[in-house]
């Protein structure tokens, strides 16, 4: 079933309440006359069914709530975490890594593991697939890149289903799994123009020839299951098991409610990985020796794409407690910046590039 037919199928017609006169002459509402299990019972049953059916796909990984070593990072030396932040941050990352390469730091080769979320999933996938190197070699970096990234930004005025998803996402006060499910429901019901094949084409702009494969074992993308609220982590092994190409993993991680997606990974519809209280998913690198963590904000100040609290500093303290040494780079955002506005891209490229010149020597020392 295609995504459009699936959503048409979900549209239901309103059914009026029929009054049925029983033998006693009492008028009974037909809706109440039907024997339906109470909500808690059906919810419990639904959870049991879902857990049983999806237990073997290997995609769901609980978010750590206390310091603990990640099975993915155990025994590794250098790891890198790339957080999210819309089109602005994708452009910032590109300028940043362009500058690091000029300074002698090839971030496509140094880390043994990269965790990317939303914008970070795009740039991480671009780096490790080799596409970023090709793009910066073939094109005038500051001339051509803004044109490429403008294709990623939403081009149409949002409709009411998109506005609903956005407003629900921007009304969240916690990152509980129940809150994630509510946002996920709204994301699923949003009629996003940036969807399906178009999302894949956008993803392939940065990930290159990765629409049929997951070419690197070092790249992990994150997302949130719209139905269950679970954290989804995709690496090469689970990607090949579920038939997930790298371009789709990056697209799902960047499927912001009311803007793009959700994106189908295996048999799960997945939304932006930042829709939780560990927005960069730093717990996945806990136990590695040294982690370079790059986030758009400190979780307290700066532009946001959800109102779910983002205690990034505490997330990082937890992985330090698990034995990981951390260098944390906070990109920061200009006052009043729109993270989804393509007009911001040229400036973001230059800002990231300039920041690389400030950080290069520190990163060299950290990973020496």
Predicted feature descriptions by range:
Residues 31-35:
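Boundary at the C-terminal end of the N-terminal hydrophobic targeting segment
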Residues 6-7, 88:
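Short, cationic motifs built from Arg/Lys/His that form the positively charged side of catalytic pockets
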């Amino acid at each position: 079933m295609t995504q459009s037919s699936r959503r048409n199928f979900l549209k239901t017609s309103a059914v009026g309440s029929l009054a049925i006169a029983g033998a006693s002459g009492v008028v009974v509402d037909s809706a109440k006359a039907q024997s339906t299990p109470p909500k808690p019972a059906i919810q419990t049953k639904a959870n049991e069914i879902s857990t049983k059916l999806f237990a073997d796909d290997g995609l769901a990984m609980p978010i750590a709530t206390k310091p603990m070593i990640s099975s993915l990072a155990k025994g590794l030396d250098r790891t890198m975490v790339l957080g999210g932040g819309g089109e602005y941050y994708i452009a910032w990352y590109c300028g940043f890594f362009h500058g690091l390469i000029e300074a002698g730091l090839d971030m496509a080769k140094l880390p043994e593991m990269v965790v990317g979320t939303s914008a970070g999933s795009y740039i991480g996938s671009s780096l490790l697939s080799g596409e970023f190197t090709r793009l910066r070699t073939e094109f005038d970096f500051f001339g051509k890149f803004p044109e490429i990234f403008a294709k990623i930004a939403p081009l149409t005025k949002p409709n009411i289903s998109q506005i609903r998803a956005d407003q629900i996402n921007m009304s969240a006060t916690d990152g509980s799994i129940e809150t994630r499910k509510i946002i996920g429901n709204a994301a699923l019901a949003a009629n996003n123009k940036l969807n399906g094949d178009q999302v894949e084409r956008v993803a392939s702009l940065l990930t290159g020839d990765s629409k049929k494969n997951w070419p690197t074992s070092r790249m992990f993308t994150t997302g949130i299951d719209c139905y269950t609220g679970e954290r989804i982590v995709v690496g090469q092994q689970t990607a090949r098991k579920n038939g997930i190409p790298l371009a789709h993993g990056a697209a799902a991680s960047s499927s912001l409610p009311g803007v793009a997606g959700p994106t189908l990974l295996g048999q799960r519809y997945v939304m932006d990985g930042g829709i939780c209280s560990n927005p960069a998913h730093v717990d996945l690198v806990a136990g590695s020796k040294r982690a370079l963590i790059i986030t758009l904000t400190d979780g307290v100040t700066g532009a946001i794409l959800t109102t779910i609290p983002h205690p990034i500093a505490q997330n990082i303290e937890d992985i330090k407690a698990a034995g990981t040494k951390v260098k944390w780079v906070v990109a920061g955002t200009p006052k009043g910046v729109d993270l989804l506005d393509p007009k911001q891209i040229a400036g973001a490229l230059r800002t990231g590039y300039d920041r690389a010149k400030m950080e290069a020597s520190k990163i060299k020392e950290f990973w020496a």
